[in-house]
Structure formats: C-alpha cells, structure tokens
Amino acid sequence: ADSAGELAGVCPATVVIQTDWFPESEHGGMYEMVGDDYVIDGDNQTTTGSLMASGVDTGVDVQVRAGGPAIGFQNTVAQMYTDTDITLAYADTDSVAFFWEDAPVVQVVTPLDKNPQMLMWDPEVYPNIYTIADLGEADVTVSVFGGGTWTELFIAEGVLSSDQVDPSYDGSPARFIAEGNIAQQGYASAEPWDYKHKFTEFGKDVRLQLVHDAGFEVYKSALAVRADELDEMAPCLERLVPIVQQAQVDFMADPGRTNALIIEGVEAIASFWTYDEGIAAFSVQAMLDLGLVSNGPNGALGDFIDERTNAVLDQRRAAGMDAPAGLSASDMTTNRFIDYNIGLPGGAETAVGLAGVCPATVVIQTDWFPES
C-alpha cells in the first residue's frame, strides 16, 4: 500500500466481496483485509470493517459475504448479476465458462493457485491406491455432491466410470465412516483434519489426491468482476488487486488474528458449519504444504496462466460440456492489475512444487572440481 486512504474516491465506499462458503481459512486473504473495527452480522452472514492494507486504512470499507446457504447455494458468478452491490465475487474457471453467455465475469486475481478439492479414501482399506485414476481402475465407489464439473469430466475422459460415481453426498461423514470402503470428495485443507480429530469414530489419516493433480487445473475461488465493468473498475483494481495479493501473503505468514475473526464469524452465523483453532491452523499449513497457496511460475502470487485456463476450456469442449466456441483465457482472466513483486517469500512455488515429484535429494554430478 502506498499510503493511507489510497482507495478513497477510486473504489466503492464499501468493497463487497462475495465468497463461496461459510467463513474458513481458505478465505483468509479476504478476512485479512478487514480492520479491527469490524462488525459481524450473523443474520446476513457478513463481516464488515475498514479495508486495511497491511495495517494501513485505505479509506474505504470492505464487506466479506458468506456463500453457500447464505445465498441459497446460488453459484457466485450468477450471484454477481442477481446482486449488483457485489464488487468482486469468487469465480471458478469452469463456472466462468458455464455462465459466460448470460453472466460474463473476468477473473482479476487468484489467492489460491491450486484448487483444494480432492478425493480421499482410507489407506488401510486401499493400501495400493494413490491416485484418482487408481480409484477408477479399482472401481471404488466415489461419493460426491451432484453437478460437479470435475466428476463429469473424469467420467468423459475415462478416469472414472459413471456407475462408480454416486452423486448423493450431502456433506455428512456418516457413510464414509460406516462403509469404510468408499472414496469421498472434500477439501484437502479441511476434511483430513476433521476425519482424524473431529470424527473420533474414524480418527485416523486419510489418503487423498487433489483434483488439480489428477488433471483438472481450474482456478478455484479467484476474484472476478462483471466483464462490462472491468475498464470502469480499472482505477480501483490497479490499487486493490496488489492489496489482495499482499493480504494473502500476510495471512499465510501470520494467520492467528484473522483465523480468530473467521471463527467468530462462523459462531455468529450459528449454522451447521463449525470451525475452531485446530482446523484453522491445519488449513493454513495444508495450503502451504500442498501448494494450494503458492507463487505461480512468474514468481507472483495471484496471476493466471493462459495455458491452464485454455486447457480447462478444451477439456470441457472435448467432454461435450458448455464452453462458448470462441471463448479463451484472454476473455476470462487478466493479469493487468497484478503486482509481480508480491509473492510468498523464498520462492514458495519451487519448494512446494518439487516435493513428492522429485527425489528427496536431487543429486547433480558435475565434470570437475567446483569452479565458476
């Protein structure tokens, strides 16, 4: 942030951010921007306060809104057109494509580099299964929410078969625990904690593979604006997007205060969703360990790679799913507001990116004594 008040007059007096679920640590960068003067409205499921940039008041307010049940489970892209008070909303690559003709939005920054969605199973029951493709070959029942793009896509690609996918999952742990021999969808930054510490009748580690690592590389929960407002919003976004980038970096470095705010928000909403310090801390660590939050190949946190977006569009078209013919990454995403100087310290994209794919020690044989 350049100085106090830098967003006043260029951004809306209240920057409204629509998220896709109850408050959770995966949304940490959003709540990181909410100042200590915050007000939580449990009925409307919002958290509002001064919009802060690394502790500096930007001169406008920010309101972070819960999604999911809070908006009747409406997709956040569609919600942007239902409620024009929303400044930015979470938008997934596949949703942007799906709604493009009726509700076009442009992604401007992605706090998450990898989608946290995964499939998990009990490694004691399936010791030789390591990937989603392995689940397909073994014909393991896969319990998922209905209507998910990636399950339809994996069926179309032959990774999974339609008869093994059961779209009746309702979020309850009962079946996974009772049957023991099924795979189930979840967030890699959440469910592994719950099934080890919260659901004590299971009480052990799961094994999982990210949907991303299985070949479906959407940008999940990226921030988007309505497409026809992009140029009008540009003076605001030029200043706001780097603040969002830095907020995510700040949250990952020191999440304690913001996680406490997230927990307070969940308690105020007082619904079926619960959250505590244990899962909040686990979530941040998992996001780092799995590279869910990481710098892209250009060294910055939050930018988009066209090849990734275009690959998802190609996958949708090959599977016979909606993706307008001429649509490409350059329509759906922009890096024009990204500050390439802002990223996780220490080149987090490489530290995370090699674990598990390269040998634990990479040995390089040179041809002489050490020399320049």
Q: Which role does the model predict for each range below?
A:
Residues 24, 71, 144-148, 185-189, ...:
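Soluble non-cytosolic domains of exported or imported proteins
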Residues 160-165, 203-208, 268-286, 322-332:
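Short, surface-exposed acidic
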Residues 1-2:
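N-terminal Sec signal peptide cleavage junction
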Residues 232-320:
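Secondary-structure end/capping motifs
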Residues 5-169, 182, 186, 209, ...:
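Short, glycine-/small- and polar/acidic-enriched structural segments
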Residues 38-57, 210-216, 231, 291-303:
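Short, solvent-exposed loop/beta-turn-alpha elements that line the ligand-binding surface or hinge
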Residues 94, 169-272:
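Pocket-lining segment of extracytoplasmic ligand-binding domains
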Residues 306-362:
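Conserved C-terminal helix/tail region of periplasmic/extracytoplasmic solute-binding proteins
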